[in-house]
Amino acid sequence: LPALRWAGVRLRFVWAWRHRAVRTMVRLSGWTVGYVIANQVALWVVLILANGRNGGPFVYLSAYAFFQLPHGLLAVSLMTTIAPEMASAAERNDLAGLRERLSFGLRLTTFVIVPCAAAFISLARPIVVALLQRGAFSAADAEVVAQTIAGFSLGLVPFSIYLFSLRAFYSMQDTRTPFMLNCFENALNIALAFPLYFAFGVPGLALAFAGAYAGAAAVTLVVLRRRIGDVDSRRFGDTLARSLVAGAFVAGTTWLIARGIGWSSTWAAVGATALGLVIGFAEYFAVAAALRMREVDDLWSLFAPRVRRGGRGGPAGGPAVAISGPADREGRTV
């Protein structure tokens, strides 16, 4: 609001509840409220299960906070950049343009999230030791949190793919379909949570989360294909396969670094984490370049103009209004 005032925009309240825009917003937001409620129901069930273990809710929520970091920094940045272009294409009824932008976003999201998932799986223990293990937080606690982070990380790629895919529905001003898909995801999460919790404890709840989003991502892509046509699935599959190959190198290298340096002290854990991330991501881009992945150039072409402008302005596709997504399990917009 201050920025708008500085730009000379004059704002005033208008009580026009029958305005078409207001009615549209109410209609769309109703399903979004249902989306959030479904998330909270699943979270409530999961936390009740986690409460059966000492410190279980803390372990689950702490691991979830770590898990959200790469998604929030990278995947959400891509969504913010590409979603307006998807909305613009949908507004023009340009399904080919919508499919192209969706495919582009899915491929870039996969490309940037795979190495994060690989690094989190291998570096979970030194990360937790570096940031959490002190005072009453013991080495045993660190081990459980690290295992839970690793479980969540197995679902990091499908989680980001699922949330990005929902942007296609929001671009078409459809919030009902995301609500239905989210009900499926939460039902699957609850169904998986019980057996996996009793088998593996709190880390099993993270595995249930990962499995639920893997299933939801697959179903969402099928629904999208029926709705708008094929989103260049062959090319997306090729990107996923090559990213997983490069990610395997990251996982192996970061695991060797973590084992070599160890995490017997806070500073050792910091060193293992920092060195692992630097070398791991450098290796990922080197392998991706060797595999001739076009996403390396695509990523640079997407963000380089924005960096040169100092982050000012919107994407190259021009201004457009995109409907924001619903909130995640902790109430943040995703």
Tell what function each PLM region has:
Residues 26, 61, 82, 94-123, ...:
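Interfacial transmembrane-helix starts/ends
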Residues 19-88, 121, 159, 250, ...:
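Transmembrane helical elements of multi-pass membrane transporters/channels
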